[in-house]
Amino acid sequence: RDVLGSRGLGDVYKRQYHGGENLEEQLSEKELADLKAKELDILVKFDRMCKENNLRYFITAGTLLGAVRHKGFIPWDDDIDVVMLRKDFNRLNRVCSKALPEGLFLQDKKNDKGYPFHFDKIRLDNTEVVDPFLEGVNMHKGIYIDVFPVDKCPENNKLAQFMFKWVSTTSYALIAKQNKDFDFDYTKKSARMLYHFMIKMPRGFVIAMRDFVVGIFNVFCSGKKLCTVSGAHGFPRETYKSEWFEEKIMLPFESGEYPAPKGYDSLLTNMYGDYMKPPEDDEKSGHFTSVESDK
């Protein structure tokens, strides 16, 4: 049995708020089209900044799947996901402080004291997306793209599962510190104890403990196996072979081309299985219930 379990952040999120019975709460076609246009504009500016500052990134998850299967957004998808290898991700804050275009905001643990997650977001100022999962959390809630770090991952599955669950549990605790109605009933006693312990600790302590564990694995793991430990799909679907990221390939996405891992076929197969087969209608859902602009 695994130590703490292995679900990703997105598993709880989708189960609580985005089952088929809640599809009527999602965005209208016009709202979705407007949201995608703004997200794409963020991606274009992010891509330009990365090129000008020698930052490597790759499209991933639903964005990568959309590029391969649709040459753009998955029709019902409402977000953009990119990843950076850890060495590039660690430069992102410094680069953004000097080069991020006006009107955009790098949301990370340093720039937004209410932000609970282990990954970053590039937010659009003067907008807001209503995300039920983050109700009560005091932070910038503008339209965004996700930027996930890719870390070294233990080759031992039990340790890898621990790494995933450590990050998700500490992140949930940071949400619960702000939203007293938020709770997750872990089935494993060890995870439940960690969750309730972390809720009582100061924010800085929780983040330091989260970063410490991830940092230890980055120091001592071989690097043959990588992972997006804060991704939506959890272990083992967000684990990769390092050679998948050794080279990039440009793939069409909407009106442009964006870098993807050369091993994208293996990545998508691991994440989605038969990824060229569209899901059933009751599995088609997005993240948001409404979008506001020009706040």
Task: Enumerate the language-model features and the residues they cover.
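Conserved catalytic core of two-metal-ion nucleotidyltransferases
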Residues: 22-51, 96-155, 173-188, 192-273, ...
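A short secondary-structure junction signal
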Residues: 156-162
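Single conserved hydrophobic/aromatic residue that forms the stacking wall/gate
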Residues: 1-16
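Small/polar loops that bind or transfer phosphate-bearing groups
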Residues: 4, 84, 260
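Helical lid/core segments from catalytic subdomains that handle acyl or acyl-like groups
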Residues: 170
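Active-site nucleotide-donor binding segment shared across nucleotidyl transfer reactions
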Residues: 47-80, 84, 89-90, 243, ...
